[in-house]
Amino acid sequence: MEVHIGLGGVYKQPPGKMIRGAFENLFLSVREALQGERRSAASLDTSSPISACVHPHPTWNEPSTWTEVRGTPWREPQGAQPDPPPCSPRSQAPQFTLSSCTTELKEILGEQGGMPEEGNSESASKEGYPESISDSAKEICKAVSVSLGLSMEALEHLSAAGEWQRGDCMFAGPPHHTMGAQTCQVAEEDKSDTSFSQYREGAFRRAGQSTYSAGKAPEDGSSLPTEDKEQPCTDMALSEPGSLRSRGMEVMPSLTLYKPTAFMEDASAYPGRDYYSFQMALAPHGRIKVESPIEFAGSAWGGPSRYSEFPGFSHCGPSANWHSLFEEGQATASYTDSSLYSYPRSHVPAGPDGEFSAEAWYPATAMLGRVHMAVPMRPRMTHGWTATLGIRRRLGWTGVESTFYPIDYYFPPQKPCLSCEDEASGCHYEALTCGSCKVFFKRAAEGNQKYLCASRNDCTIDKFRRKNCPSCRLRKCYEAGMTLGARKLKKLGNLKAQEELEGSPGQSEGREMPPNMSIPQLEGYSCQPIFLNVLEAIEPMVVCSGHDNNQPDSFALLLSSLNELGERQLVHVVKWAKALPGFRNLHVNDQMTVIQYSWMGLMIFAMGWRSFKNVNSRMLYFAPDLVFNEYRMHKSRMYSQCVRMRHLSQEFGWLQVTPEEFLCDEGPSALSIIPVEGLKDQKCFDELRMNYIKELDRVISCKRNNPASSSPRFFNLPKLLGSVQPIDVNLVQFTFGLFGKAQMVSVDFPEMMSEIISVQVPKILSGRVKPLYFHSS
């Protein structure tokens, strides 16, 4: 909606060119103020009583007259008035004199020869186009405008218009009152030319002191007689409801350029004044057109394409109440008259009843349509609007920031699958995985299938290569924490037991199995395959040390390679422990403590198994690229420790340990050393350790056909774990001594190994930890 605002009122017709920018409004205001001053002085005739009360009103085509009658309210003109109302002596004096101009305007008029003269004003009035500014002043204004890159074409259309001057705001509409004037009187408007209908405009004139102060109403609420009513200057003078004289101004967001008046500078002059109850006089530009609903979102006025929800507002737009800030006795008026905002647009023809269509008020409705929003939508938060939106919420602006959102607003980013890094579809088998890994794990875990990796158990498992190696994929599923629940295991065990019984009907008919013998065997048979599949899947992969076998063996080279191998294996040990069934039920601090104290024993136990499987316990198989023979054992200066480790590897062969028994022994070996003072959740630790011992017993019972032979084996296998503890303490002591003279012997220690050796090994050597044995002897 377009409203053409000048310093003297609302213009009837639009100018030839839209004025934009703060500098153009500034020069326009100064120029029109000078024109209005000269025009008011030129149009006065002291000999006529009418000329003392009638003043030209600035319009775009035809100047209208402004009249003032003291003590007379607003009235609609009934045509041409033969006799004007009498004017008071105060109103007969010229309303615009040089004293009403500011000091700057006086200096411009005095220096540039712009003072009005009687002869010039009369000739200018007769020609109908008065002289606006002197030639030198014109040249100055034009030169400044050209230097600032502004156009002077818009100023040429206003050469015949006289305007008021506002003192407290640089760009503003007509003033309501000043400190000296407390009331405004508006008289009827006389038009001699009735050949075509034009919209009439009201006027503001200075008057004397009124009975009531500005902005106040009678306390008892009684109405005054028509002759004694006065229009307060707090807001724009309003006409009666339904009249064409009622109008409003749509205040758009503009530059808040405020020029304080002289009375504001002295705060001590008014000690009782409330400086927080006044509205800020924010003036708009000369002509502003805003159609974006974002500017009005959430405010009391609504958007320009919808009506306000507050009563008393016929359309969106704030009240055009201009105030001289912080004036004594000033109050903010509330408008309840719907005709306040029913002013017409001069360039759009009205309907037959004087009403204007929606297209006249909202020219963009045909393209955008009406916006009906009963409930505020959620604003789209951006980096630049965060602080601004917070301020708007504090001010009560909680509406729509933007009605369009990016596509990722409605579809938040998905979390990746912990197994193949695809988009996870939910929590399956106690882990956040995708649907493909869910189906794969169900088939692999319940089907008791044996998968073998064609590589080194280190295949890359992602969205595109997850089907290449099922063995590594299943291992990664177990590492992610996927596990079959207890109910699932029990159900699966019952089904397999039923199939086993149905498979041999003749045997079951021939002889009955004792109940005390059948239940342990069924439970052991049903539960062990699934549990062993989990342990097999999470088994740490074989890691290479990076040792260069082409170089001659030396103490520093062999020990540095062993330390590097320990660093790499430690990473896999941590991953294996976290994937160990039941290990995450421990307290977080207990998990770290167990790993830091048992990492050396786990590596010794695993190295003994690899030596037994790969080289038949003849050598120490630390890694595929690092195998210790007799020569390297002597060269490393740790021959006694190597002999003990080789003896441990030989015990695997003497006992004929199976891979399933080794997997079940590996869990208890991680839970074989704790601090002397105990753990934070010692009860949970003891339950977890006892469960692994029971699982080892079930594996032994399941693999041995003769139950009588299971007891000696169950005694020997845990004893194998007990033989790891002396080797662990001896090797830790050797490592700590080597760490103290590492720089002297040129042996490299990786960062993680250095931290553990310097912090945890002294606790082990000082007796602050205790090993847990399965047997007393």
Swiss-Prot record:
Residues 53-95, 110-132, 205-241 are annotated as: Disordered. Transmembrane segments: none annotated. Keywords: Cytoplasm, DNA-binding, Lipid-binding, Metal-binding, Nucleus, Receptor, Steroid-binding, Transcription, Transcription regulation, Zinc, Zinc-finger. Coiled coil: none annotated. A zinc finger (NR C4-type) spans 417-434, 453-472. Residues 526-757 form the NR LBD domain. The record marks 755 as: Interaction with coactivator FXXLF motif. CDD domains: NR_DBD_AR, NR_LBD_AR. One of its GO terms (cellular component) is cytoplasm. Detected in somatic Leydig and Sertoli cells in testis with high level expression. Also detected at lower expression levels in forebrain and heart. 17beta-hydroxy-5alpha-androstan-3-one binds at residues 563, 610, 735. The record marks 578 as: Interaction with coactivator LXXL motif. Steroid hormone receptors are ligand-activated transcription factors that regulate eukaryotic gene expression and affect cellular proliferation and differentiation in target tissues. Transcription factor activity is modulated by bound coactivator and corepressor proteins. Belongs to the nuclear hormone receptor family. NR3 subfamily. This is Androgen receptor. It comes from Aquarana catesbeiana (American bullfrog).
